Amino acid sequence: MKIQSMFQKDINRDINGVIKVSQDDQQSLKQELSEYIITKELRRHFATFFDNYVKAIDNPTDKIGVWISGFFGSGKSHFLKMLSYLLSNKEVDGKHAFDYFADKFDDPMMYATVQKCVRIPTESILFNIDIEGPINKDKTAVLRVFAKVFYNHCGFYGEDLKVAKLERFIDKQGKT
């Protein structure tokens, strides 16, 4: 018996060593979702996130935010990408993100919490701030990047915030 025959999946398949936000083809997403492993530490982070998220669902607030930090290569982008897929319950290969995670949450309470969260219609906007951001960085650079990406997501011209705001105003007037 060869060691490689002991594995459920082909060990010679392509495995992407670096998770990229922009890599969103169905095959890559399916592999990421199906092969994502929730370690003890990740379980704790998912629990913290979703416990607080469900509190904001039960008691709406504008005082919610998330800060994800860690060393290079520690899995921040991968974790964030999985959160994004779960929150939007993205459909990949005919299966929703939550369904890929159904057997990954071994705690029934956490499973129920995540399930409650994914039932709320949510849009997530994933982007790499280094790619979207301006070369000249000043005090408002991060804010401008967020606004640009948001307006682009809404279908407006986010490259020029004045134009995007005008488009949004016209859209709200129902004149588009």
Locate predicted features.
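Short coil/loop residues immediately preceding or within conserved phosphate-binding loops
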Residues: K63
